[in-house]
Amino acid sequence: MLLIPAIDLKDGKCVRLKQGDMNDSTTFGEDPAAMARRWVDAGARRLHLVDLNGAFAGKPVNEGAIKSIIAAVGGDIPIQLGGGIRDLDTIERYLDDGLSYVIIGTAAVKNPGFLRDACTAFGGHIIVGLDARDGKVATDGWSKLTGHEVVDLARKFQDYGVEGVIYTDIGRDGMLSGINIEATVKLAQALTIPVIASGGLSNMADIDALCAVEHEGVDGVICGRSIYSGDLDFAAGQKRADELNGGRV
């Protein structure tokens, strides 16, 4: 079970949003590269970046900060990025810069052909991000709720060849209210590709619960507000996960 620290970028700074609200953000760092190094030094084996401005603008905005993170730790661990990725040229540029994976969210839901083309052109590097409330997929920085069922879309995207799915429960993200284990497992059971949980991780009990369902296909969890607020010690959490699944993955 991988614990994956999230670095959410807004105006070049490291922030956390509450339930995806750009007007309700807390700044946790002015130096994204230093933040990335902090998590790698604490034992992170993958990083999750989000270009928040990009997600709302529909194009890359925080490229300078992203490149600084890649320069700092890209040679050490894989880095995945979501937010504002809407065309193949952007994907190619990011992968050339040194990212390991790009995460396609809104664009995958609105334009499935784009996701299919991305999987064809950049096989092994495309992750789909599905954000949902009550099982229904949301788009556009969580501002629009669709009628699509998460499981149905995920199966379709699996057929396209995506490398994995990041599943975010919008109602819990940034609230420290616990991972929605039931919904995450339901999705993982419907797929053969890995599912990464996101939204609500708050403490060691959540890690215990996730490790208990790792065999269902839940391979990792995005760590956000909890590791910044101090509610969860990241290094201790990853150590616990390693112990529970029988050693380092």
UniProtKB/Swiss-Prot annotation:
It is an enzyme of class 5 (isomerase). Pathway: Amino-acid biosynthesis; L-histidine biosynthesis; L-histidine from 5-phospho-alpha-D-ribose 1-diphosphate: step 4/9. InterPro entries: Aldolase_TIM, His_biosynth, HisA_bact_arch, Isoase_HisA-like, Isoase_HisA-like_bact, RibuloseP-bd_barrel. Its EC number is 5.3.1.16. Its main location: cytoplasm. It comes from Leptothrix cholodnii (strain ATCC 51168 / LMG 8142 / SP-6). It catalyses: 1-(5-phospho-beta-D-ribosyl)-5-[(5-phospho-beta-D-ribosylamino)methylideneamino]imidazole-4-carboxamide = 5-[(5-phospho-1-deoxy-D-ribulos-1-ylimino)methylamino]-1-(5-phospho-beta-D-ribosyl)imidazole-4-carboxamide. Belongs to the HisA/HisF family. Keywords: Amino-acid biosynthesis, Cytoplasm, Histidine biosynthesis, Isomerase. One of its GO terms (biological process) is L-tryptophan biosynthetic process. The active site is at residues 8, 131. One of its GO terms (cellular component) is cytoplasm. Gene3D superfamilies: Aldolase class I. This is 1-(5-phosphoribosyl)-5-[(5-phosphoribosylamino)methylideneamino] imidazole-4-carboxamide isomerase. HAMAP family: HisA. NCBIfam families: 1-(5-phosphoribosyl)-5-[(5-phosphoribosylamino)methylideneamino]imidazole-4-carboxamide isomerase (TIGR00007). Signal peptide: none annotated. The gene is hisA. Pfam families: His_biosynth (PF00977). The keyword Ligase does not apply. It is found in: Cytoplasm. GO terms for molecular function: 1-(5-phosphoribosyl)-5-[(5-phosphoribosylamino)methylideneamino]imidazole-4-carboxamide isomerase activity. It comes from the Bacteria.
